[in-house]
Amino acid sequence: MTNGQKIEVAVQLPESKVAATENNETMSGPLVVGGGVAKPFGRKADVMHVILRLLCTITSVTAVSFMVTAHQSSTVSIYGFMLPVRSKWSFSHSFEYLVGVSAAVAAHSLLQLLISMSRLLRKSPVIPSRSHAWLIFAGDQVFAYAMISAGAAASGVTNLNRTGIQHTALPNFCKPLNYFCNHVAVSIAFAFISCLLLAALAVQEVIWLSKSKY
């Protein structure tokens, strides 16, 4: 009898150890994904993040492209005199500011796009940790506000070019310089679209942070 009891205990100990191991795996399984990285978002959300980042890159590059090609020469009538006029984006500090901010946004978005696509292709979470989420959230916020200020400053100069100055002989410069003004207007429009896309990315990152506990 004593020998039989000893054999029973020897057999039961491994079973209880296996059961405890299974319980530990079951408890930790849903909380940890891929080596301790939390993944509150699914595959669709990761794909949406990459699409938004791609669109932001395209719109910011388009804003830069249209602005740097905005230049034209023509003539304008002031007090009956036909005077030659030449306009170029680099003549205005507001337009230079818009080009600088748009280029910075394009570089930031392209870098984040490459990182996100590499993670997506490896089937890893696009946002791997809270620290990474906070970092890109801060970057998106800063660039969104900078883009708003640049677009607003450029819009003021463009509006002055289109309306002229009241009570003076200064005309609507966009009539003889329509190519220049149209390029500037398109650039400003894409700058504001980039700002909206950055805001959408920031919202997605806030949702990620609210769902993540790690």
Curated annotation (Swiss-Prot):
Keywords: Cell membrane, Glycoprotein, Membrane, Transmembrane, Transmembrane helix. It comes from the Eukaryota. Residues 71-96, 154-182 are extracellular. It is a multi-pass membrane protein. The keyword Amino-acid biosynthesis does not apply. Glycans are attached at residue 161. PANTHER family: CASP-LIKE PROTEIN 3A1, CASP-LIKE PROTEIN 4A4. Homodimer and heterodimers. Belongs to the Casparian strip membrane proteins (CASP) family. This is CASP-like protein 3A1. It comes from Ricinus communis (Castor bean).
